[in-house]
Amino acid sequence: MALSNASSLSTRSIYGGDLSHRPSNRQSSFTFHPAVNTKPKSVNLVTAVHAAEPARNAVSVKESVASSSSGALKWTPESWKLKKALQLPDYPNANELESVLKTIEAFPPIVFAGEARNLEERLADAAVGKAFLLQGGDCAESFKEFNATNIRDTFRVLLQMSIVLTFGGQVPVIKVGRMAGQFAKPRSDAFEEKDGVKLPSYKGDNINGDTFDEKSRIPDPNRMIRAYTQSAATLNLLRAFATGGYAAIQRVTQWNLDFVEQSEQADRYQELANRVDEALGFMSACGLGTDHPLMTTTDFYTSHECLLLPYEQSLTRLDSTSGLYYDCSAHMVWCGERTRQLDGAHVEFLRGIANPLGIKVSNKMDPFELVKLVEILNPNNKPGRITVIVRMGAENMRVKLPHLIRAVRRSGQIVTWVCDPMHGNTIKAPCGLKTRAFDSILAEVRAFLDVHEQEGSHAGGIHLEMTGQNVTECIGGSRTVTYDDLSSRYHTHCDPRLNASQSLELAFIVAERLRKRRTGSQRVS
């Protein structure tokens, strides 16, 4: 996989300057000082311009970011502390927090800079229709469900989906997991109440516990160390699966044929599955046998929301090859809907790291605000650096997305447009559990593809909360999950996920849509 082309990294290059002058409106939970209060070391400080290499068609928007507070501040891995930080936990023991962060700073990187650069190049292809992004995995990874079987099953379904999408679109599919680090979750409410008892909300296993008691809900910095070790172990297993023969195309194709045979809509998917199988036979006859590396290995990347900034900073390293800083907790990180403030701490941190970045966008996003945010994060307009992940429901998608596309196009910015059909379709079932309807998810994907056809832009991919397990969290699909079924296998720690069958069914439908668009046929109804 691409994970083998790693660039060398220097040791940690984060200086320990005095930040006692920072504004008082920053969350007090992160008021920690270096043990030795010295002048900043002489390092290659990264500005927003240095975060991404100059592109040929660099452009500016109406308001130059240089005049904004983000542009005026010299970036360092800890300059985010000078900004207002939302959604961060309030750790009760600052000394314990500092000790944990220093421990993580001494750990090896989880991913390497060269791998992140490879992903950025692939995403640049998706921006112009030469590739398609498949990004999927847990809403929130957990410590309790961490085992090789769960990792393998999710990886397997992503492989199956990628084969189907590759054949339908006739372009490479970029496989990126919401895995090996997707723990922290932003919450709408800081507290939750049950039976008259009010406690802090569960914010992810790397912050606090989901058990509803006072001890579990206290943020514990030591959970970050466990999250690091679980992420490293997960990625180690993913590397083995990707390069050790498990990802062989012939094996994955047989899995898809088995799925089709067991599907209630077998006739709908049989033709596509058989065509993939025939294509493999043709390739084998031409001499590209099943033992060729192209047929037995695959590239796989990891991603998560950049939410817990102290953890992300502690894994930020100066790459000795490029002279740029990379957040080595994942190949790609994204900024969530609740933390994308132009003058906020999360945007400040993200603008200085060289990883490919995602921006989650709902129907609340103003087109001009999106243009300004992209300019802050990608001032040199480097293709592949910015992926805009749209999440707003089918109806809003048809109304709001065209304005966002037009605003970005007018600015001359290059982004990769991706559809997240999950977050805009969460409802509460009669039994009280959160769920999502498969038909609503599919409707949003179709709306996303329709809008891009109408606007003459490129639909760059899909972003899904999904699992390889046979859970019953989203209703619908060909193997129908009903409201009555939800409680039987409802295992999510946060939001409902598509199960393996629903995920693969969605991939077949999207692949057929991509194939018909490619061949100039009528749209799928």
From Swiss-Prot:
GO terms for cellular component: chloroplast; mitochondrion. Residues 1-35 are annotated as: Disordered. InterPro entries: Aldolase_TIM, DAHP_synth_2. Pathway: Metabolic intermediate biosynthesis; chorismate biosynthesis; chorismate from D-erythrose 4-phosphate and phosphoenolpyruvate: step 1/7. Induction: By pathogen infection and wounding. Its EC number is 2.5.1.54. It is an enzyme of class 2 (transferase). It catalyses: D-erythrose 4-phosphate + phosphoenolpyruvate + H2O = 7-phospho-2-dehydro-3-deoxy-D-arabino-heptonate + phosphate. Residues 1-13 have a biased composition (Polar residues). Transmembrane segments: none annotated. GO terms for molecular function: 3-deoxy-7-phosphoheptulonate synthase activity. Its main location: plastid. Keywords: Amino-acid biosynthesis, Aromatic amino acid biosynthesis, Chloroplast, Plastid, Transferase, Transit peptide. One of its GO terms (biological process) is aromatic amino acid family biosynthetic process. It is found in: Plastid, Chloroplast. SUPFAM superfamilies: Aldolase. The keyword Transit peptide applies. NCBIfam families: DAHP_synth_II. This is Phospho-2-dehydro-3-deoxyheptonate aldolase 1, chloroplastic. It comes from Arabidopsis thaliana. The lineage of its organism: Eukaryota, Viridiplantae, Streptophyta, Embryophyta, Tracheophyta.
